[in-house]
Curated annotation (Swiss-Prot):
Localization per Swiss-Prot or TrEMBL: Cytoplasm
Gene3D superfamilies (UniProt xref): 3.30.70.330, YVTN repeat-like/Quinoprotein amine dehydrogenase
GO BP terms in the entry: formation of cytoplasmic translation initiation complex; translational initiation
RRM domain sequence ranges: 42-128
Taxonomic source organism: Neurospora crassa (strain ATCC 24698 / 74-OR23-1A / CBS 708.71 / DSM 1257 / FGSC 987)
Protein name: Eukaryotic translation initiation factor 3 subunit B
Principal cellular location given in the protein's record: cytoplasm
Length: 747
């Protein structure tokens, strides 16, 4: 029975012995404490100011105001700078902004900004100062921090030093629940470096220069590297789905389809400002978030218009300039927002308004245009036809925001932007429709970015639909795949044609006009994979249940050149054709020597595993692996050799090749010798075991009085019996032989 008032003792009711101070209600006070953010969330405290007197104070306030107004709006009368008893300032100021969002932006963008050579600003929210600086939060006595002993970090580029001295590349394989990193051993079994169970929950991904291996988990993203494969960085973005690096590995973007929800107890990396956001941009060096963004809403159809199809999810949603100084985001149909790094403030405080903009893409390298000496990064964009205005392709320079080249286009159904790897060319694949909109054709508009004035060359109209396009890396040739039938989900994929294009020969270093080299018809190909070094290309049929062809081409074949191609800068030759049933992915290694193809269990469960080919299309290795999910070569950073050193290597390439071939032959022969020796050793061990058993059996027979050779003894015992029981028999055999045949005809 529950206790009642009658069960209480008299001493329990004695109020004189009750002390209010002894009751601990700190948990209740903390739970129901009034938060100061409600009244002071638009205030910031600016620390690190120079010491000034009353006469110098107005000048400092005006100078400080210029900095403060770069992120929001405030006035001189909203800046309070306390003065000491000696008439000098206390080196900090209180500033009121017009909104809490501006105050938050000031803390994010002005903190650690230099005011001059000797002073650096520290900006914090007033509410944060009160929250973290109140009584009990800070010790009155100074406690020196514990300085940990210096520990030398592992070299994150150690993978560039192959211990075998053969310059091998590494790759990662994700199969079942296991992730392993291996050295490529060509025909032999890959050499395992590290293999771990449950290393990732969804997928793995290399960083662009190969420094880190990314694992993805429900709690966030982790980066691994070094000889011992320890965790180097951690980014706590709950339920992360996708990851993208900046080209130079300085920054990272994470995305989750679930908006971030900050719990009441807080988050180890994110703040309340990140609540409800989907994207987070991180600084890899510090592992700290720079800024977060929410998912953009799909624009609704205008009244009276048919509802638009849901667009494909854009990834990467944030695109990086080649030097990591800018990151940009598309607001479809309205603008492009360009942010400066690492502050993540909007360039010139405004987005670049481009009516109707559909897509954009940065140049993959910093381009030096003819006659332009100033620094710039370039991106291209395109807009569709709006009313009577034509479609337009533009080339914009950043940070000036100047459109350096534009091109008007008519009767445009769609356009795709394709940069060459060095930014020397931009190809705009334009799908055009006839006036009746019943037929379509494709034109290729090629911008020669490095030439003066950025001239545009139009390649002959292609009547078929172009379904794939790929530039030669560091080159000026390209391959397209076309089809005469509409592209879509069909039971039998349509037949395709593969066309090769290259420039004409020109004097000096000039690049001639682009010309058609050759078209191969009645193919099933749908994907193009160039070697990262150029020259060689694999044209493949992937994710196709009917066909799985792999065609290996050489565009600089050293054999006889057809007369029709004498004036062109290519000599096309099919080197080999392979077949990998169920192939879903193809990837070249960074050296351009090997090609890996694999059938991923993420797409189907038939004959999962990988094949390895050399650049000529000769199969080196085939391995079927159950639940094989992912294969990815480890990227290499750019070479440290100068152009002169690279030219010297090319001049002496034949001599190097002879040395490498000799080393390969020695390695193969030594491997063969090792196999023979191992087999001989096993055979000798077996002979020794057999002899030991024979002696042991002989000793046991001698002990038990048994004959040493039971078979011989048995034959000896049976022979007399057979001689007496059987009579002597004579066996005769008669054989007939035809010596001659004569045929007579009787009439």
């Amino acid at each position: 029975m529950a206790p009642s008032f009658d069960h209480l003792r008299d001493e329990d009711l004695d109020e004189d012995d009750f002390d209010v101070d002894e009751v601990d209600i700190s948990d209740i006070r903390e739970k129901y404490e009034v938060q100061l953010e409600q009244g002071y969330d638009a205030f910031v405290v600016v620390d690190g100011l120079p010491e000034v007197n009353e006469e110098q104070k107005p000048k400092l306030v005006k100078f400080l105001l210029k900095k403060l107004n770069t992120v929001g709006k405030t006035r001189e009368d909203l800046i309070f700078m306390p003065m000491g008893e000696d008439g000098k300032s206390l080196r900090f100021a209180f500033v009121e902004y017009s909104s809490p969002a501006e105050a938050a932006a000031a803390c994010r963008q002005l903190d650690l900004v230099p005011l001059d050579k000797k002073h650096t600003l520290r900006v914090n929210k007033l509410t944060d100062v009160d929250r973290y600086g109140r009584e009990g939060r800070i010790d009155d006595e100074y406690t020196p921090p514990k300085i940990e002993e210096f520990q030398e970090k592992e070299h994150l580029r150690s993978f560039m030093a192959d211990p075998s001295g053969r310059g091998r590349d590494q790759f990662v394989m994700f199969r079942g629940e296991s992730v392993g990193v291996f050295w490529n051993n060509e025909k032999d079994t890959p050499e395992n470096i590290v293999d771990r169970q449950h290393w990732t929950e969804t997928f793995v991904q290399w960083s662009p220069l190969g420094t880190y291996l990314t694992s993805v988990h429900a709690q966030g993203v982790q980066l691994w590297g070094g000889p011992s494969w320890t965790r180097q960085r951690r980014f706590a973005h709950p339920f992360v789905n996708l990851v993208a690096f900046s080209p130079n590995e300085k920054y990272l973007v994470t995305w989750s389809n679930r908006p971030i929800s900050i719990p009441e107890e807080g988050h180890p990396a994110l703040s309340v400002e990140d609540d409800g956001k989907n994207y987070v941009i991180w600084d890899i060096e510090t592992s700290k978030p720079l800024r977060s963004f929410a998912q953009l809403d799909t624009p609704a159809a205008a009244e009276g218009e048919a509802p638009k199809k849901a667009p494909k999810f854009p990834w990467p949603a944030f695109k990086w300039s080649a030097d990591d100084k800018y990151v940009a985001r598309l607001n479809p149909g309205q603008s492009i927002s360009v942010y400066e790094l690492p502050r993540m403030n909007l360039l010139d405080k405004t987005a670049i308004k481009i009516e109707g903009v559909v897509d954009f893409d940065w140049a993959p390298a910093t381009v030096q245009r003819d006659g332009v000496k100033s620094y710039e990064q370039l991106f291209c964009f395109w807009t569709p036809e709006i009313g009577s205005n034509p479609a337009r392709v533009g080339l914009m320079s950043i940070p000036s925001k100047q459109v350096v080249r534009s091109l008007n286009l008519f009767s445009v159904s769609d356009a795709k932007l394709h940069w060459q790897s060095e930014g020397a060319y931009l190809c705009v694949k334009v799908d055009r429709h006839s006036k009746s909109k019943k037929s379509q054709a494709t034109t290729l508009e090629i911008f020669r970015v490095k030439e003066k004035g950025v001239p545009v060359e139009v390649v002959d109209t292609i009547k078929d639909t172009v379904i794939n396009f790929a530039w030669e890396p560091k080159g000026d040739r390209f391959v397209i795949i076309t089809t005469t039938e509409p592209v879509g989900a069909t039971a039998v994929p349509p037949k395709t044609s593969v066309a090769f294009f290259c420039p004409e020969k020109a004097k000096g270093n000039a690049v001639g006009n682009f010309k058609h080299l050759r078209t191969l018809e009645k193919k099933n190909s749908n994907a193009i994979y160039w070697s990262p070094k150029g020259r060689f290309v694999v044209v493949a049929t992937v994710a196709n249940t009917q066909s799985s062809d792999l065609d290996f081409y050489d565009l600089d074949f050293e054999g006889e050149k057809p007369e029709s191609d004498k004036d062109l800068t290519a000599n096309l030759q099919l080197m080999n054709t392979a077949d990998h049933y169920g192939v879903t992915d193809v990837e070249w290694d960074p050296s351009g020597r090997f090609v890996a193809t694999w059938a991923s269990a993420w797409k189907h469960s038939m004959e999962n595993g990988y094949h390895l080919y050399d650049f000529k299309g000769e199969q080196l290795r085939e391995e079927a692996i159950e639940k094989f999910k992912q294969f990815q070569w480890r990227p290499r950073p750019a070479t440290l050799l100068s152009k002169e050193e690279q030219k010297a290597i090319r001049r002496n390439l034949r001599e190097y090749s002879r040395i490498f071939e000799q080393e390969d032959a020695e390695r193969i022969s030594s491997a063969d010798v090792a196999v023979v020796e191992a087999r001989r050793r096993l055979l000798e061990e077996w002979f020794a075991w057999r002899e030991a058993i024979r002696q042991e059996v002989a000793e046991e027979r001698e002990i038990y009085g048994l004959p040493a050779d039971p078979v011989a003894d048995l034959i000896k015992a049976k022979t007399p019996e057979l001689a007496t029981d059987q009579e002597e028999q004579v066996i005769e055999e008669i054989m007939e032989e035809v010596l001659e045949e004569t045929e007579e005809i009787v009439q």
